[in-house]
């Protein structure tokens, strides 16, 4: 049996529940990974919070039997995308992975695609295309938090075409994704101005960025830090208008959070949609050689009450780095 954390209805962290399920069996091109660590991300609580609820209404109209069939219980939906662990089973036509391999990966799916299991499970069934080898020098906790951060950061920088000599503003620079964006941009020869709380100023300096505090007077503080800004990556949301006022061309403004201002200023909605699984391997290699670090804010065990507490902390919005769920 495997333990799975998921939800059957939309709401706050209280909708998360734990269930014992049969061990997944890998099909063609699939593997099962015994999870050792799994990072959590804001998209997770947005999903179980009901961001896709309008789509559910459409489905109900089209297929009412899915919801109202007598005695039928709603399926448990999986939570989580990031993971790292040890391969415990392989399916047919899997030639480059064997049982015992240490891997990390990302469960990739569109938000409207219901997953019976996410990465918050003791055993994860996934396509072999969703995993990459874990470098031996990288801990499971760090590897387990890399998937979304690495793919999103690489995708965002690709989208806005960050190059050597650029001056890049990163909003939410102290977060899990923002910290990786900051380091990758600097590794390309760009200068980074990081927007974060004053408490994270020293942390951003340690990454090589120039910190500026959010709040009233932000635009002026950025102008004082850099006479000209050439690119803007918004990992927090709501900064497209600021980027426009700073004179950044719309095609060089990327945001991870869609808002009406994106269309108004011809900015770009970016992130994982512009990333690939190979980006995760690239960043994992950089973590292994020390050129990129992933800060782990806190770890919680894979127990439903602890997972609820982890998401509650993440929802507070002031996490430095990543929160990771661990299993033995």
Predicted regions and their residues:
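Glycine-rich beta-strand-centered segment in the early N-terminal region that forms part
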Residues: 22-39, 53-107
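Cytochrome P450 core scaffold surrounding the K-helix E-X-X-R motif
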Residues: 43-45
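Conserved hydrophobic helix-helix packing surfaces used for dimerization/oligomerization
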Residues: 4, 167-168, 253
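Non-catalytic, hydrophobic alpha-helical segments
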Residues: 4, 83, 153, 307-310, ...
């Amino acid at each position: 049996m495997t333990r799975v954390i998921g939800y059957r209805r939309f709401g706050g962290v209280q909708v998360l529940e734990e269930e014992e399920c049969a061990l997944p069996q890998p099909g063609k091109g699939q593997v099962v990974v015994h999870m050792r660590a799994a990072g959590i991300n804001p998209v997770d609580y947005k999903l179980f919070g009901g961001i896709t609820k309008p789509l559910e209404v459409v489905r109900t109209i089209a297929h009412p039997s899915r919801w109202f069939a007598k005695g039928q219980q709603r399926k448990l939906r999986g939570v989580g995308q990031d993971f790292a662990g040890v391969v415990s089973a392989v399916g047919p036509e899997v030639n480059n992975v064997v049982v015992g391999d240490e891997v990390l990966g990302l469960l990739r799916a569109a938000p409207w695609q219901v997953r019976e299991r996410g990465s918050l499970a003791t055993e994860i069934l996934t396509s072999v295309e969703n995993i990459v080898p874990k470098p031996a020098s990288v801990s499971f906790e760090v590897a387990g938090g890399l998937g979304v951060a690495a793919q999103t950061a690489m995708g965002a920088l690709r989208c806005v075409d960050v190059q050597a000599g650029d001056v890049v503003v990163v909003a939410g620079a102290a977060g899990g994704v923002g910290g990786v964006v900051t380091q990758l941009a600097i590794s390309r020869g760009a200068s980074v101005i990081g927007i974060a709380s004053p408490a994270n100023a020293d942390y951003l300096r340690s990454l090589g960025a120039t910190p500026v505090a959010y709040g009233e007077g932000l635009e002026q503080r950025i102008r004082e830090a850099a006479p000209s800004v050439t690119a803007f990556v918004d990992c927090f949301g709501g900064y497209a208008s600021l980027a426009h006022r700073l004179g950044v061309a719309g095609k060089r403004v990327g945001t991870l959070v869609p808002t009406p201002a994106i269309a108004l200023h011809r900015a770009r909605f970016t992130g994982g949609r512009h990333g690939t699984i190979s980006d995760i391997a690239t960043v994992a290699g950089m973590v292994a050689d020390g050129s990129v670090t992933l800060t782990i804010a806190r770890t919680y065990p894979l127990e439903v009450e602890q997972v609820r507490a982890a998401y509650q902390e993440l929802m507070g919005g002031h996490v430095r780095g990543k929160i990771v769920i661990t299993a033995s």
